[in-house]
């Protein structure tokens, strides 16, 4: 039974909305075309070859000064010249050797040929399209005096008129006696044809007649022609030959019912034709049409969408709901009119129009038959006229740019009405046929995105459709998302979402495929209640794109993003736990991998770059080319720019043996060139290196090398530098010293030898942050070798410690306590630790380091002698030139010339400098010769905290002889103790001077007091030294000066001293340095001991504030001079 009429009272009739004039769209399209043609219009007339040549010459001469370039061309303005440059900017940006005037001429010739060729072809193809636009407007046709059959009872608002000036195809279709079969659409059987359409006339409402008489534009004629075609189609919407009801079209309704039915037919036809596949734009003309007819429909596409389509949607959304049987007849007629094929009974009568969901609760209407088949279909005599009108309308829609809003809304309106009408008619449809139909529906949906029918409230084409679609996908339940990812269905056309158990069944949602966009949630929620009013409690409408869910589902979707967000927060806030088992397993796997020879070999090929080869492999020619052209800063290039770049770079080489051979030859030439630069730098012929060359390795630099025999990677130090090889001392004593090629030596810190051009692209601070341990070890290694003996501290002790040497925890604690209580006592502990660490080294390490120092001293002397030999050779050549000039009779012409004198003086000055270098190298070599005779650190003081038995430090006596005299530790400690006492006495004298008023008398007394105290300290120190000479391995824990010394030291930090503001610690260290220098000059000590004492004195003067570093540098220079002078007096 049909639903009760009480439901219809809910909706009020509203007048049909007025058609919106399409002038705005035409204006926007014209503006868009104007913007597109702007650059070509700015070019002006076609450029000749001479003008292009002059433009290119002027551009290369004046650059981007367009006024000057235009003046150089003479016949062009600055705007035209700039437009030409903008069009060929990518090509003109190339360097002058790559780009040429020939290429510019060729590019412009191609541009004009494509421009003219494209316009000619368009003119030929669209010849029939341009004719109606330029034709004058024809006179309006007044209302017809001959009403057609069946239209007598219509009211005025349902009458239509047409124009004979804009759409001649509609008029022609109704004046021809028989349809003309064209091309492949020749029917296989004879087609019956009716002559009723010749007598059919058009009607026009009085309101529109009055407006047209005043003179409206041609766009209204387009609208009325479409309305007329649809009205005729609705009047003759009888069934096809399949239904065998040819007389159904003669069935008449009352005027009011007939008007409602006609409007519904118009809306249905517009919706179906707007949903036609866009791929059929270029299809052949429909049955009964010619090429000329199809060419006449160029301009009316926007008119349709703004005319009848939008008004139909607005009317449909607010209109009434029709009975099930009547709408069913209408749907059947309209569908068969559009398709007209024999395929309808193959799928079953109910299945070809509707689809049922899997549980049989939700049904949907689907347009099943494609247009490709409909174009080849055959029609009966009763329906061919209506099909002609619909085909004409279809041809018009295919030529129009489909407006998304109107098309979507029209389709949505039709689907909503169809679904409401048929919701209870096909309740028991066969599930098997439904699954078959569903599969067909899914395949069509993927192929034809615009054929889907959807809810008008849910489908709105907007710029933010993609964003809304992403939001809707995020709002899916987590379980659904996991299932989609798990089953790899992200690219499928539907996602099944479970709903609440309120009789709504399953719901299908597309995954953003095709031209449909996601629905807006506001309209989704606003219209959901309205859609439920038109459905029964057991059956619900499920649209193709997205259905209106129940209130429970809406609440669930609203709350879902919050749940997902909270779960994500919990995951991110979970603390990171380090599993020791996984770390150990990873270390084990890594060690197992490194144990493989192939893995190590692969690491060498991947990351090992020698200092000389690194700039070659780090060079990127393509990046250099982009920088040269000026496109290096552009993150993304256009297609035209890529084309110009590819054409300028040429065809890429094939990776072949010949290619590798040529690249190797280039690499060998590069290496020879770099070595030549290095040799010139070493000989003094070159002041510096180019910016793109790596700096050579220096002597004593830490490197990573490939061992020439084992071909494994090992660490080592550079001992000597040769032309193409280095003498490397490996850290492993078993490997010894080997000559290694310069292509197999890599610096431990690549930044030290990196070229200046590449170093600028590196963040030096980031490297230090990422490699703090490596950098610290490298700095220690650089300082470990100084004048042939290693400098050690307590921080590097663990690197050189041996199993037979241990430091007790109590001693470490003692060091902390002493450093916290008295900073001055910390120096003695540090020195004791350093000395003990050195004495506890294995003898092999000392021998290796001694050999390294010997080789270094010898290499420095050899290099100095080579330089001196070159200078002497040059000096000899100059002398020979003077002698030859005198023999030739020039007398002293050459000798008296100013240039010769300057050159000769420069050579002599260079010779004097080289002589100094040779003398220093000889001195270093002599020091190494005496170093082997004496072993430093033969004795050491023991310093411990009283009362702790473990606070003692043992050592092994290294067979020191009595002839060595004072040891380094004795000199350092005695000097520091004496300096502290002197400062303490001086501070006491200053206090006395501040208290008394008679400063002259007190000054003399203070000086006498200080001298007396110093003399007493000297006598005490001599007695202490005598008692220390007979002691064995264990020594007292405190030095022999009086026990009041620590107390005296503690007095230095009293408030009185703070009031005086005397830097007693710094003063005591400076005085200790002077005392050390004095003691080193009194007797001839071994050079190693002298150097060590002076270095310890300089190290003690290192400032805490960075502002004092320049002063400290000057002190170091002065101490170096003093050391050289002292060592020069030492006999070899």
UniProtKB/Swiss-Prot annotation:
Residue stretches making up the SANT domain: 42-93
Single Gene Ontology BP annotation: DNA-templated transcription
Tissue specificity annotation: Expressed ubiquitously in vegetative and reproductive tissues.
InterPro entries: DIRP, Homeodomain-like_sf, LIN-9/ALY1, SANT/Myb
Sequence ranges of Low complexity compositional bias: 433-442
Main subcellular location of this protein, as a coarse class: nucleus
Region feature Disordered, mapped onto this chain: 1-43, 115-157, 234-257, 283-320, 333-357, 422-476, 500-554, 941-963, 1018-1059
SMART domains linked to this entry: DIRP, SANT
Pfam families assigned: DIRP, Myb_DNA-binding
Biased composition (Basic residues): 1-17
GO cellular component: DRM complex
UniProt-listed SUPFAM superfamilies: Homeodomain-like
Name of the protein in its database record: Protein ALWAYS EARLY 3
């Amino acid at each position: 039974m049909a639903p009760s009429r009480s439901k219809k009272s809910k909706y009020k009739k509203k007048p049909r909305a007025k058609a919106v004039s399409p002038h705005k769209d035409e204006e926007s399209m014209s503006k868009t075309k104007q913007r597109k043609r702007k650059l070509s219009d700015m070019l002006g007339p076609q450029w000749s070859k001479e003008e292009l040549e002059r433009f290119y010459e002027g551009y290369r001469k004046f650059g981007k000064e367009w006024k000057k370039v235009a003046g150089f061309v003479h016949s062009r303005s600055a705007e035209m010249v700039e437009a030409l440059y903008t069009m060929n900017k990518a090509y003109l940006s190339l360097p002058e050797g790559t780009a040429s005037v020939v290429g510019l001429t060729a590019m412009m010739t191609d541009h004009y040929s494509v421009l003219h060729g494209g316009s000619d072809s368009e003119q030929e193809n669209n010849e029939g399209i341009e004719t109606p636009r330029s034709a004058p407007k024809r006179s309006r046709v007044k209302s017809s005096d001959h009403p057609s059959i069946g239209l007598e009872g219509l009211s005025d608002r349902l009458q239509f008129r047409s124009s004979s000036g804009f759409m001649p195809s509609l008029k022609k279709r109704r004046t021809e006696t028989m349809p003309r079969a064209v091309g492949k659409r020749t029917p296989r059987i004879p087609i019956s044809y009716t002559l009723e359409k010749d007598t059919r006339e058009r009607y026009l409402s009085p309101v529109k007649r009055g407006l047209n008489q005043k003179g409206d534009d041609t766009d209204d004629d387009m609208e009325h022609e479409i309305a007329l075609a649809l009205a005729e189609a609705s009047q003759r919407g009888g069934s096809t030959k399949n239904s065998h009801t040819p007389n159904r079209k003669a069935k008449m309704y009352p005027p009011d019912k007939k008007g409602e039915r006609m409007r519904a037919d118009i809306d249905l036809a517009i919706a179906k034709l707007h949903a036609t596949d866009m791929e059929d734009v270029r299809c052949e003309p429909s049955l009964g049409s010619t090429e000329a007819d199809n060419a006449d429909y160029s301009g009316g596409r926007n008119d349709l969408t703004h005319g009848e389509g939008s008004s139909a949607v607005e009317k449909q959304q607010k209109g009434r709901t029709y009975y099930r049987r009547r709408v069913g007849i209408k749907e059947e007629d309209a569908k068969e009119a559009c398709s007209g094929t024999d395929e309808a009974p193959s799928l079953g009568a109910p299945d070809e129009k509707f689809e049922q969901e899997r549980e049989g609760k939700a049904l949907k209407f689907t347009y099943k038959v494609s247009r490709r088949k409909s174009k080849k279909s055959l029609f009966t005599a009763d329906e061919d006229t209506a099909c002609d009108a619909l085909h004409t309308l279809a041809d018009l829609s295919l030529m129009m740019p489909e407006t998304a809003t109107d098309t979507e809304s029209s389709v949505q309106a039709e689907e909503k009405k169809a679904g409401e009408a048929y919701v209870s008619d096909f309740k028991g449809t066969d599930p098997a046929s439904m699954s078959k139909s569903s599969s067909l529906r899914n395949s069509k949906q993927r192929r034809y995105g615009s054929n889907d029918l959807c809810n008008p409230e849910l489908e709105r084409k907007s710029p933010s459709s993609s964003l809304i679609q992403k939001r809707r996908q995020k709002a899916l339940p987590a379980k659904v998302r996991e299932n989609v990812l798990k089953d790899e269905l992200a690219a499928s056309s539907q996602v099944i979402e479970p709903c609440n158990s309120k009789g709504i069944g399953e719901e299908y949602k597309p995954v953003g495929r095709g031209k449909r966009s996601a629905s807006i949630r506001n309209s989704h929620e606003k219209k959901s209640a309205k859609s439920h009013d038109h459905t029964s409690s057991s059956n619900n409408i499920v649209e193709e794109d997205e259905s209106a869910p129940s209130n429970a589902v809406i609440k669930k979707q609203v709350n879902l993003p919050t749940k997902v967000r909270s779960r994500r927060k919990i995951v991110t806030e979970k603390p990171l736990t380090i599993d020791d088992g996984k770390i150990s397993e990873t270390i084990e796997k890594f060690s197992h991998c490194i144990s493989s020879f192939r893995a190590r070999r692969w690491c060498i090929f991947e990351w090992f770059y020698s200092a000389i080869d690194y700039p070659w492999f780090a060079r990127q020619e393509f990046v250099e080319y982009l920088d040269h052209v000026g496109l290096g800063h552009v993150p993304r290039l256009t297609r035209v720019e890529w084309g110009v770049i590819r054409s300028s770079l040429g065809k890429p080489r094939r990776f072949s043996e010949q290619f590798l051979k040529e690249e190797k030859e280039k690499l060998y030439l590069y290496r020879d060139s770099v070595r030549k630069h290095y040799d010139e730098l070493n000989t003094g012929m070159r002041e510096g290196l180019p910016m793109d060359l790596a700096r050579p390795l220096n002597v004593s630099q830490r490197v990573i090398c490939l061992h020439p025999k084992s071909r494994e990677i090992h660490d080592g130090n550079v001992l000597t530098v040769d032309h193409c090889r280095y003498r490397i001392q490996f850290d492993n004593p078993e490997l010894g010293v080997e000559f290694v090629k310069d292509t197999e030596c890599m610096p431990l810190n690549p930044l030290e030898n990196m070229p200046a051009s590449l170093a600028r692209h590196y963040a030096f601070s980031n490297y230090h942050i990422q490699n703090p341990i490596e950098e610290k070890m490298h700095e220690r290694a650089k300082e470990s070798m100084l004048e042939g003996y290693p400098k050690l501290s307590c921080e590097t002790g663990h690197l050189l410690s041996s199993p037979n040497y241990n430091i007790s925890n109590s001693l470490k604690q003692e060091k902390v306590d002493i450093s916290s209580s008295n900073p001055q006592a910390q120096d003695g502990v540090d020195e004791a630790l350093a000395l003990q660490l050195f004495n506890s080294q294995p003898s092999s390490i000392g021998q290796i380091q001694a050999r390294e120092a010997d080789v270094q001293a010898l290499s420095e002397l050899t290099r100095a002698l080579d330089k001196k030999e070159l200078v002497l050779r040059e000096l000899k050549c100059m002398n020979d030139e003077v002698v030859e000039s005198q023999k030739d009779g020039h007398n002293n012409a050459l000798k008296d010339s100013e240039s010769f004198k300057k050159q000769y003086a420069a050579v002599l000055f260079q010779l004097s400098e080289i002589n100094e270098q040779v003398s220093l190298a000889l001195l270093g070599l002599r020091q190494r010769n005496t170093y082997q005779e004496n072993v430093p650190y033969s004795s050491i003081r023991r310093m411990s905290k009283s009362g702790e038995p473990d606070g003692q430090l043992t050592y092994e006596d290294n067979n020191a002889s009595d002839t060595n005299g004072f040891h380094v530790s004795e000199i350092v400690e005695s000097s520091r103790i004496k300096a502290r006492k002197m400062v303490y006495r001086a501070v006491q004298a200053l206090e006395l001077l501040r208290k008394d008023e008679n400063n002259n008398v007190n000054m003399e007394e203070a000086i006498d007091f200080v001298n007396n105290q110093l003399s007493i300290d000297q006598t005490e120190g001599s007695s202490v030294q005598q008692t220390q000479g007979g002691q064995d391995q264990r020594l007292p824990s405190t030095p022999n000066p009086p026990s009041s010394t620590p107390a005296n030291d503690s007095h230095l930090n009293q408030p009185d001293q703070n009031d005086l503001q005397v830097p007693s610690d710094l003063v005591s260290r400076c005085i200790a340095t002077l005392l050390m220098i004095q003691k080193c000059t009194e007797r001839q000590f071994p050079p190693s001991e002298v150097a060590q004492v002076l270095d310890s004195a300089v190290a003690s003067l290192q400032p805490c504030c960075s502002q004092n570093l320049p002063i400290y540098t000057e002190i170091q220079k002065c101490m170096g001079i003093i050391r050289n002078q002292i060592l020069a007096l030492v006999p070899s």
